[in-house]
A protein has these predicted regions:
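N-terminal, positively charged/glycine-rich alpha-helical extensions of SAM-dependent methyltransferases
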Residues: 1-38, 317-320
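A short SAM/SAH-binding and catalytic strip from SAM-dependent methyltransferases
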Residues: 143-158
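Class I SAM-dependent methyltransferase SAM/SAH-binding core
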Residues: 49-135
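Conserved Class I S-adenosyl-L-methionine
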Residues: 220-320
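A short acidic, Gly/Pro-enriched loop at the edge of an enzyme's catalytic core
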Residues: 133-145
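Conserved catalytic/acceptor-binding region of the Class I
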Residues: 171-231, 238-255
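Conserved alpha-helix/loop element of class I SAM-dependent methyltransferases that forms part
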Residues: 28-50, 60-64
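A short glycine-rich, Lys/Arg-flanked "PGG" loop and its adjoining helix->strand segment in the class I
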Residues: 158-173
Length: 320
């Protein structure tokens, strides 16, 4: 069963900002999983007009999504405004970047404004610094929710799933990926106090409970090998971040501790000269029913008048 995590939101935001500086240099894991997600889109008939990318970071996947769905408006949401500035710079002309800079620096007002209006289909990508637990979108305003390897940074996964259901339109699609429970299980070292990863069955149950239909969940192992322990650490930090637990040790990791970590990884080097790492990658998608459940668990009820026979009128009970 999914439960709220012990993650510190402030620490998550600071780590995301630090990773934004060099995320693209160590982005192999996210890009590989993203490509696998895109292959699944080839099998799904869906034509969105509004796409919400949750936890987009520097939005390296935005060009591919926008190319696939040229008619759609792309909305990228992330905790880090710094990451989104990189995304805006990479995807828009300088004139749009200047406007976006002022926009992001006044995030509070913009987010309040977005709650009152749905985005317009088509046009340039839009990037918004926002809490993924409270998206600045009105109800039933998005056709496709896309989230690539962002799950481990959700403080309250159940609240995020409920928010996804709130903003998705009837017959809209949710597609996401996440690190699974078996990720890094065999990785030893002083940083073993990593955030616990979800079980795919628990995610499926949460989707159904929130109101999504026909969830399809799959898990596969990604076997990686690194020649240098330092590269392994750098790539995992780019994909996962550091220790953001509320009860984490606040002091810096000393050189001696870091050296012991490197030595522990080196001791795991296999016969082919590589240090192995195993990640469990969960991929899932689900649909929002055409008759979408309302907030507070309510469901819409439609009353259809009984067919009127030819030449007769419906019989109504007499008024008292």
């Amino acid at each position: 069963m999914l439960k709220p995590s012990d993650l510190d939101p402030k620490s998550l935001r600071l780590q995301a900002t630090r990773r934004a500086r060099n995320a693209l240099e160590r982005d192999f894991i996210a890009r590989e999983v993203e490509q696998r997600m895109a292959e699944r889109l080839d099998l799904i008939r869906h034509v969105p007009t509004i796409i919400a990318d949750i936890g987009c970071g520097r939005a390296a996947g935005q060009p591919a999504l926008s190319a696939r769905y040229a008619q759609a408006t792309y909305l990228g949401f992330d905790l880090s405004a710094a990451a989104l500035r990189h995304a805006q710079h990479a995807s828009a002309p300088a004139s749009m970047l200047a406007r976006a800079g002022r926009w992001l620096s006044q995030a509070g007002g913009v987010l309040t404004g977005l709650r009152g209006a749905a985005p317009v289909a088509g046009g340039a990508p839009i990037f918004v610094a926002a809490d993924t637990h409270k998206l600045p979108l009105r109800n039933s305003s998005v056709d496709l929710i896309w989230s690539n390897l962002a799950w481990h940074g959700f403080v309250d996964p159940l609240a995020v799933v409920a928010e996804w259901h709130r903003v998705v339109r009837p017959e809209g699609l949710l597609m996401f990926s996440a690190f699974g429970v078996d990720s890094l299980r065999d990785l030893l070292g002083p940083q073993a106090e990593l955030v616990s990863f979800p079980d795919m069955h628990d995610i499926g149950d949460a989707l159904v409970h929130a109101g999504f239909a026909e969830p399809v969940m799959d898990a596969e192992r990604m076997n990686l090998g690194y020649r240098r322990a330092e590269d392994l650490i750098a790539e995992l930090r780019a994909a996962l971040g550091g220790n953001a637990l509320t009860g984490r040790r606040r002091s810096l990791l000393g050189r001696a501790v870091y050296r012991r970590w490197i030595d522990a990884l080196e001791s795991r080097r296999s016969a082919d000269g590589l240090i192995p790492v195993v990640l469990e990658i969960i991929q899932g998608h689900a649909w929002c029913p055409s008759r979408k459940r309302l907030p507070e668990g309510l469901s819409p009820v439609t009353f259809t008048p009984r067919a009127v026979r030819s030449g007769t009128a419906p019989i109504l009970p007499p008024r008292e």
